Amino acid sequence: MKRLPLPALAAAFLAAAIAVRAQTTRPAPEDGATVHEIEFSNFDSDLSPGEATTVTPAQLAEIYGPNVGFLDPYGFNRPLDLLIEPLDDIYDKLGLRLGTAYTMLYLQSMGGQAGGQARAAGDIDFMSSWTLIGRGTEDTGRFIFTGEYRFGVDDDPPSTLGPQMGTLIPPTNAFNARGWVVRDAYWIQRLFDARVRILLGRGDPSDFVGAHWMQNVNNSFVNRHFSANPAVPFPGHGPLLGLSLRPIPEYYLTAGAANAYSNTELVEIDSLFEYGDLFSFLETGYTPTFEKLGPGRYAAGIWHMAQRDRTNQPEDYGFTLIADQRLAGNFQVFARYAYSDGTLTNIRHLGQAGLGWSGLGGRRDDLTGLAFSLAVPVRNTSRDETVLETFHRFQVTQNSQFSVGLQLIANPGNATLNETAGVFYARLRLSF
């Protein structure tokens, strides 16, 4: 495979970041840390406080948020005003919020059985959220639609690096070459002052349960230990029904079911009615706000994957425990434990903890992350895998971010060589 020159690719990333303009002028952020800037999942964004920040409403909120980049004072926010202002007018008049994001990832392996391998891929997201009922009230009805295009820069995208390195869980999975897909097409309805929320349509259950606050491959950790919940055999995008209840603001109960045969690359519903096999889930959580700390989330969830006769796959079930907490100032921490009883993911136990620090170096919208994870496999042919990942994300302009990160993978779980491997990565994200 042709190797990608790191200096040239890094230079291209930086050049693109400098060339991009961010959002139109937004309200200046208040002094100090904000929930938005340190990547908290918006408690009121979509279906459940337990959802990941990869859900479309949260991504749109991030695009249109009051970010401040270090190049903004030099006039790099001018060129896209002609594009952004009409989009704002559409939202003001119709309640239709549109957004586009382009994310590029470069990986370079170091050591282990696949050292010196380079991979790069891109991802383009087209997102929309249309409020058609109850705009300006708590009880809104919105239609969410997103499309995505993923492509590899060379023959092998970053998603292929994990198998070559022999990892139990890949350094990344999201950056592949699957092409065009329809990700989301669902209706979300709020009732009784948003205490009841119902989701119906095409979606991915992994966006709504089992996630921690820093679970976002686009702007946070990249390794799938942290950017997903790899102990759970989520089926992908397809028919989904979700219900979330909030009897009091500090408590939630979210449940749902999805077609067990859902595949993000396919748009079909026949298998649901022909076989009736479901992936089901339930999550309950407590979301207090501590006076000297800030908001937190403490949740427990269970899930069940039915036996799938069509694909000859066995039944599986498990549970997840999650703690997210903001600490005083610009810090947040998370911890997660996940258990799977079956063999679908080859992960029996997953335990991890991490932290995020916003404002390192005095730039309030920069984010630094550090996390540790241990995965224990089901099969005795694999071994325990431990991962340490750190990254720093620079807010270049209001809507452009550049990140660099490092992963250390001790004893990759399926490798023939029992030694530590490493992965360096660089990531660019542009959005408007």
Task: Describe the residue ranges of each PLM region.
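N-terminal periplasmic/intermembrane-space "pro-region" immediately following the signal or transit peptide
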Residues: 20-109, 115, 131-137
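Short loop/turn motifs that connect adjacent beta-strands in outer-membrane beta-barrel proteins
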Residues: 80-98, 131-143, 192-195, 249-250, ...
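Transmembrane beta-barrel strands of outer-membrane/channel proteins
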Residues: 100-106, 143-149, 198-202, 253-259, ...
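Solvent-exposed loop/turn segments connecting transmembrane beta-strands
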Residues: 113-118, 271-276, 308-314, 339-350, ...
